[in-house]
A protein has these predicted regions:
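Conserved functional micro-motifs across diverse proteins
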Residues: 1-115
Length: 115
């Protein structure tokens, strides 16, 4: 997977969306946890204030808020990104096991289809 979406201010790549077992959490019945890894690139001529407002949507329904278990790498979070640089991080979403379409929404305008 290497899905990328670009705006004038920044580009977001989701290069991983895989099942994860985030002990000690257990998913709700008929759900499983997925780790989504993101790379955010500043495309502006100055510093970008990036707010990690990320939502997971499965078959038109918003998934529960993301968690950041220790089993993952660094969390994707609010940060400043200098001109020409990137940041990266992961979030973990609880997704219904039978979901046909899963979309990650970053902010208001970026949507990345991950399933």
């Amino acid at each position: 997977m290497n899905e990328k979406a670009t705006l004038t201010k920044y580009a977001v790549t989701c290069d991983k969306f895989e099942p994860i077992n985030p002990y000690p959490w257990n998913p709700a019945p008929n759900n499983e946890f997925f780790e989504a890894h993101f790379i955010v690139e500043n495309l502006r001529d100055d510093t970008l204030e990036f707010e990690a407002d990320v939502t997971c949507i499965a078959d038109g329904y918003q998934c529960k808020e993301p968690i950041t278990p220790n089993a993952m790498g660094e969390e994707l979070k609010y940060t400043y990104i200098n001109k020409g640089l990137k940041t990266q991080g992961s979030l973990c979403f609880q997704v219904p096991t039978d979901a046909k379409e899963v979309i990650i929404k970053v902010g208001e305008y970026i949507e990345i289809k991950v399933r």
